[in-house]
């Protein structure tokens, strides 16, 4: 068949473009089409590493899963990762440079060439490409340097669907205003509008839809109801890391760092009955959890200093002395050591900082970035978390720091190459690792949570059965696709795509 494409652009950030792309990808896949997602430029600290060691935005990984494809860095050729005064630019899956944000325009033409090459390669491998824009497509102050919205639609020669979010209010003004701000040639690309996150009686809303269509002379293809799906996407960051007051039988506190990255590490914990995940950034919020997790961060030293300044650092040390188990992941792992050195200014202007001193490791930042998928085994139980020794785990590493392991550190995780990628202290109260995604290993997470409950005298009435991660995700993608089919004019959408 001839190559087909369609692009979802938004009236603003967080209107649900990623979710709608995911929905359409799964629908088209279920129709037997060879479909793939594409986003020219992503801005996120929530990244992923492909099998060939290339880094890309997490949202396109989700969309690839909906297409039943392995994630491919071609799907997201440019990823911007803000870090303090600088932004790290990932191009074609590898670090391209660290740049001050105001200088980004200087890279525009270079990145545009890379984006076009990536799209051309991807489109040769698939029959249909579903593209996603970034933020608002009508930011007139950024138009000259924009490579991810209408400029990308032109490169792909893709028809555009404009998405707006009614839940935040002002949906009609945002749709009309967005279209009016575009030049005529770009307006002509918009073939339909989708109103997202609707709550209420659709029959009462229909007259307003007709009025809108008369004003813009573009059909509204449907109204998507507000519905929650357990799908990782950039728009869910705020929802996931908000502070929850309710406490289940097992209370896990995750430190909400200013530059926190890879929040998807903890998605599976949110799905386990009687487990409450609380994100905290003040000593008073920490209380007495059953487990403290310090997550990954794009600026380890700065976030460590922030914890010292607001006394959260002291509170964590106090809880450790009373026996509260602590787990650090990536940047959190580095913080648990004795010293962090950044003489090259990889993350910022602070050259060194003392860590918690819980683990006998010293970390030095290098310009070379480690990006790889990793499989390994748990080498020992922890004091509060037993029955995990011997568990097989898999995940991925994204870090500039290299940690030198001292004699007092106890090896906790060894990868299949024989390298130690995590250690614990001699009391086995504190542990850390470079592995993101380790909780997605079903055998490990089941034993981990069950043992943690038992250690805290929480009744475990039956084995903790966690639905296989891939099956769970698959069901959510199908549920999303079904809602999309029920509320969007699929016939008209296919006609726009010439399918």
Curated annotation (Swiss-Prot):
One of its GO terms (molecular function) is catalytic activity. GO terms for biological process: cobalamin biosynthetic process. Pfam families: CbiA (PF01656), GATase_3 (PF07685). Pathway: Cofactor biosynthesis; adenosylcobalamin biosynthesis. Residues 249-444 form the GATase cobBQ-type domain. It comes from the Bacteria. The keyword Protein biosynthesis does not apply. The keyword Transmembrane does not apply. Catalyzes amidations at positions B, D, E, and G on adenosylcobyrinic A,C-diamide. NH(2) groups are provided by glutamine, and one molecule of ATP is hydrogenolyzed for each amidation. PANTHER family: COBYRIC ACID SYNTHASE (PTHR21343:SF1), DETHIOBIOTIN SYNTHETASE (PTHR21343). Belongs to the CobB/CobQ family. CobQ subfamily. This is Cobyric acid synthase. It comes from Clostridium beijerinckii (strain ATCC 51743 / NCIMB 8052) (Clostridium acetobutylicum).
């Amino acid at each position: 068949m001839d190559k087909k494409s369609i692009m979802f652009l938004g009236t603003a950030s967080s209107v649900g473009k990623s979710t709608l792309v995911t929905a359409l990808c799964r629908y088209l896949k279920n129709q037997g089409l060879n479909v793939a997602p594409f986003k020219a430029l992503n801005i996120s600290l929530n990244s992923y590493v492909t099998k060939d060691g290339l880094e890309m935005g997490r949202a396109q990984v989700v969309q690839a899963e909906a297409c039943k494809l392995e994630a491919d860095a071609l799907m997201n050729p440019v990823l911007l990762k803000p870090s303090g005064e600088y932004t790290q630019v990932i191009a074609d899956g590898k670090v391209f440079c660290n740049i001050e944000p105001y200088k980004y325009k200087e890279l525009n033409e270079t990145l545009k060439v890379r984006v076009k090459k990536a799209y051309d390669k991807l489109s040769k491998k698939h029959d249909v490409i579903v593209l996603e824009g970034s933020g608002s497509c009508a930011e007139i102050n950024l138009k000259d340097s924009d490579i991810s919205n209408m400029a990308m639609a032109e490169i792909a020669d893709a028809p555009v669907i404009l998405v707006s979010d009614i839940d935040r209010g002002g949906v009609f003004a945002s749709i009309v205003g967005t279209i009016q701000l575009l030049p005529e040639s770009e307006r002509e690309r918009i073939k339909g509008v989708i109103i997202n996150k609707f709550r209420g009686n659709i029959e009462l809303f229909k007259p307003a839809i007709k009025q809108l269509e008369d004003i813009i002379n573009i059909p509204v293809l449907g109204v998507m109801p507000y519905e929650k799906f357990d799908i990782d996407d950039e728009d869910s960051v705020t929802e996931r890391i908000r502070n929850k007051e309710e406490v289940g039988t097992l209370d896990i506190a995750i430190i909400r760092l200013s530059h926190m990255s890879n929040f998807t590490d903890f998605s599976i914990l949110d799905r386990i009955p009687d487990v409450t995940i609380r994100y905290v950034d003040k000593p008073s919020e920490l209380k007495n959890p059953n487990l403290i997790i310090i997550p990954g961060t794009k600026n380890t030293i700065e976030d460590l200093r922030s914890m010292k300044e607001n006394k959260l650092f002291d509170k964590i040390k106090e809880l450790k002395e009373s026996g509260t188990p602590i787990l650090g992941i990536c940047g959190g792992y580095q913080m648990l050591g004795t010293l962090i050195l950044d003489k090259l200014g990889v993350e910022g202007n602070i050259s060194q900082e003392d860590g918690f001193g819980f683990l006998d490791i010293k970390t030095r930042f290098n310009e070379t970035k480690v990006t790889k998928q990793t499989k390994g085994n748990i080498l020992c139980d922890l004091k509060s978390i037993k029955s995990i020794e011997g568990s097989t785990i898999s995940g991925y590493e994204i870090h500039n720091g290299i940690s030198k392991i001292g004699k007092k550190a106890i090896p906790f995780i060894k990868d299949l190459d024989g390298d130690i990628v995590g250690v614990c202290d001699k009391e086995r109260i504190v542990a850390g690792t470079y592995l993101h995604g380790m909780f997605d290993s079903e055998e490990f997470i089941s034993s981990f949570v069950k043992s943690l409950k038992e250690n805290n005298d929480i009744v475990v009435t039956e084995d903790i059965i966690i639905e296989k991660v891939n099956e769970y995700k698959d069901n959510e993608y199908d549920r999303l696709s079904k809602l999309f089919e029920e509320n969007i004019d699929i016939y008209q959408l296919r006609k726009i795509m010439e399918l």
